[in-house]
């Protein structure tokens, strides 16, 4: 059974590569986003992962920066099931065979860490994308954790929403056993684990629910990017605690939506 699911994943990856190579050059933004969402839903379904949206789900189609805690390489596809976004990733990912090219074709913005000039370039690109109506998703911790804590947020990229005059949307991610609701570390891409090792852990685990909790949009304050980063982290920490059952959910209508129904199955 595990071998068949791995084969299905390989075929699904090939389908994604062909879609990007053959169709994407001829498609508009809306149709590309439909394909990205559909492909991501199918990937998660093969992995045995369902999606649950919790809290006041933000209005789609408006430019903003989404900030979230980072647990797994699955995070990107989980977020795509809600709304396809532009992600900021380290430049090394671009050199990964096949996957790097796939990320580039789906709009990932790559940054060379440690190069100040490149950080300025990426800030400019993020600002432009948001002003054009795109959601840009960043993981300000700069690394992955097992989900038990939220590391301090780096502040550099927070300059982009300040410059654009657009909001920051705090989001918390949590993976749990679909049957018991208990937190699972199977998807955690941490320490010396490789991508294939985490994939094996996911495929061997019981069905998983990926929870996405949304907070209220944050506006830039007079304190600048450092204050905005700290405020965003506080919001994400509060959301994580809510997911763990230690605090009430944020105001708004809660929603529990399976991945298969988060979007229409027909491109607009």
Locations of the language-model features?
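A transmembrane-helix-recognition feature enriched in membrane-embedded lipid enzymes
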Residues: 1-52, 101-106, 205
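Conserved H-X4-D acyltransferase segment
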Residues: 2-5, 36-91, 102, 146
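Residue-level preference for the first positions of well-ordered beta-strands
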Residues: 63-65, 108, 135-139, 167, ...
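A cross-family acyltransferase "interaction/gating" segment
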Residues: 98-100, 148-223, 227, 231, ...
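Soluble extracytoplasmic domains of inner/organellar membrane proteins
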Residues: 119, 126-127, 131-158, 162
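Cytosolic-facing loops and C-terminal tails of multi-pass membrane proteins
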Residues: 226, 231-268
């Amino acid at each position: 059974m595990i071998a068949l699911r791995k084969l299905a994943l390989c075929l699904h990856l090939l389908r994604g590569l062909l879609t990007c190579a053959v169709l994407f050059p001829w498609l508009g933004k809306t149709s590309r986003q439909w394909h990205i969402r559909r492909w991501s839903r199918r990937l998660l379904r093969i992995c045995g992962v369902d999606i649950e949206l919790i809290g006041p789900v933000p209005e789609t189609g408006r430019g903003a920066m989404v900030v979230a805690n980072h647990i797994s390489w699955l995070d990107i596809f989980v977020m795509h099931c809600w709304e396809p976004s532009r992600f900021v990733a380290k430049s090394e990912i671009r050199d990964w065979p096949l996957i790097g090219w796939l990320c580039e074709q789906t709009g990932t913005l790559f940054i060379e860490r440690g190069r100040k000039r490149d950080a300025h370039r990426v800030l400019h690109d993020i600002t432009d994308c948001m002003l054009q109506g795109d959601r840009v998703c960043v993981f300000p911790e700069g690394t992955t954790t097992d989900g038990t804590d939220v590391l301090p947020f780096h502040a550099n990229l927070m300059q982009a929403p300040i410059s654009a005059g657009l909001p920051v949307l705090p989001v918390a991610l949590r993976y749990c056993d679909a049957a018991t609701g208990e937190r699972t570390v199977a998807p955690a891409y941490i320490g010396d684990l490789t991508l294939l090792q985490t994939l094996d852990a996911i495929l061997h685990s019981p069905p998983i629910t990926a929870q996405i909790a949304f907070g209220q949009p944050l506006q830039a304050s007079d304190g600048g990017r450092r204050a905005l980063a700290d405020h965003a982290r506080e919001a994400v920490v509060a959301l994580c605690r809510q997911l763990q059952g230690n605090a009430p959910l944020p105001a708004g209508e809660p929603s529990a939506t399976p991945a298969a129904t988060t979007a229409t199955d027909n491109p607009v």
